[in-house]
Amino acid sequence: MRYSAQIRAARALLGWSQTQLARRAGLGLATLQRIERNEGIQKGKFSTVIKIQKALEQAGIYFIEDDTGEIGVRMKIKRR
């Protein structure tokens, strides 16, 4: 699952623990851990990934993909 690496990278950029991200996304810790381990999401639970994505985007994370299909994340930092 491509999301797993992006979620781990985004969390690292923010300096968040799995517990912090799970809380901000409104998910159980075990659910987030399963997704980060690349064990996938249960059928019909794509909404779980959307919750994670929204929590990360609200913190300034952008999910990116280039025209070669490579994926990644970047973080927007406000200038002072």
Label for each model-derived stretch:
Residues M1-R2:
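A detector for short, charged/polar N-terminal pre-domain segments
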Residues I7-Q20:
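Short basic helix-loop element that most often maps to the first helix and adjoining turn
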Residues A12, G26, R37:
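Residue-level detection of the helix-turn-helix DNA-binding "recognition helix"
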Residues S17-R34:
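Short alpha-helical DNA-recognition segment
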Residues E36-V49:
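Short, charge-rich, low-complexity interaction segments located
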Residues F46-F63:
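DNA major-groove recognition helix of helix-turn-helix/homeodomain DNA-binding modules
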Residues I61-R80:
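Helix-turn-helix/homeodomain-like alpha-helical modules used for DNA recognition
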